[in-house]
Regions:
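C-terminal functional regions that serve as terminal interaction/effector modules
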Residues: 80-88, 93-95, 99-180
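Alpha-helix initiation/capping motif
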Residues: 16, 43-44, 59-60, 117, ...
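Long, positively charged binding patches that form subdomain-scale interaction surfaces
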Residues: 38-103, 107-108
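Mixed-charge (acidic/basic) macromolecular-recognition segments
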Residues: 1-54, 159, 170-180
């Protein structure tokens, strides 16, 4: 077994922003995003910075806490992806109990527990990826070194549009640097 180091993306200034934006808008499935990144030698965050704000917009880092509490209050089902290079855990369902404690944001559900140290969130992005069923909207969280911490989506079934409630909850988040 031979291990290979992860490919290092090129600096974003070498990428063609118009081409990346055009390719993003042409997607018909969220999974095509991985191919877009590979084709243009980009990290997720580099791609986010290259496209229009309607596709990727940086939001304040308190977005996770706000979104989880709103989803809990409304009871709509969400998906939370947390992973690393070797493993991904996916939660799908309604968030039942959110407990902030000593800098940690905790979710306590009967079948899912998450403990996230809020100060480790360096960047938070709302992204919209086109699919054959309309846009799929997510909140993506990153550490200072660019490592992805988590992705959140409204629960949806392939072939169905995104929850309008989820979209409204995401749209309520404040873009970074703008007053609420």
């Amino acid at each position: 077994l031979e291990l290979k180091a992860a490919e290092t993306p090129l600096p974003a200034e070498k990428a063609d922003a118009a081409l990346v934006d055009k390719a993003w808008r042409a997607m018909t499935d969220v999974h095509q995003f991985f191919g877009l990144l590979k084709l243009h030698y980009l990290s997720r965050q580099q791609a986010f910075r290259l496209v229009g704000d309607d596709l990727a917009c940086q939001v304040e880092n308190n977005a996770l806490a706000l979104l989880l509490e709103t989803a809990r209050q409304h009871g709509n089902e969400i998906m939370i992806f947390v992973g690393n290079r070797g493993c991904v855990q996916i939660f799908t369902g309604a968030v039942e109990k959110v407990v902030p404690m000593k800098g940690w944001l905790n979710i306590f559900n009967p079948t899912f527990t998450l403990h996230l140290l809020e100060e480790t969130i360096a960047e938070s992005w709302v992204t919209r990826k086109p699919t054959a069923d309309g846009h799929v909207t997510s909140l993506e969280l990153f550490a200072a070194d660019g490592t992805q911490i988590a992705q959140l989506y409204g629960q949806r079934t392939e072939g169905e549009p995104e929850q309008s409630q989820w979209r409204s909850q995401i749209d309520a988040l404040t873009p970074k640097g703008l007053a609420a």
